[in-house]
Amino acid sequence: MRTVADYQFGAGAGEALFPLGEELTVRRSTGGRPRQVVADEGRLVSYGVDGRFTLGVAGGRRLHETLDGEYTVAVGDESEPFVREGKNVFAKFVVGVDDAVRPRDEVVVVHETGYVLAVGRAELSAAGMEEFETGMAVKVREGAGDPASE
């Protein structure tokens, strides 16, 4: 699983998501295929049938702390409460994005000051998110919820 994470998110992602020696729970399908990887703080990733991971908020936080802004989309104060609740991110509210983001990449949505708001799937390229004034930039899968719970 570390190899898949390194391939999908870049070098160091596997160790960030699945540190050696940490007790992780792997939930499997009835056929034995891994479905979810869960840590004490919550779901890290789900393993899709396409062989790629979809991030949980806990996994997004781990990646954000380790990968120095890779696979992130930043938004400002105006959209923060909506994104926290799990609402989608629209291009007009994007204030920054990693240049390497492509459509269908898993991304971490952060506030412009740096804390994690949500995780989801990019619908536009980085250039599209920066240039477009309309359209969905990120299809949010899971919002981080109430900031008091962090």
Predicted features and spans:
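Generic short beta-strand
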Residues: R35, E106-V108
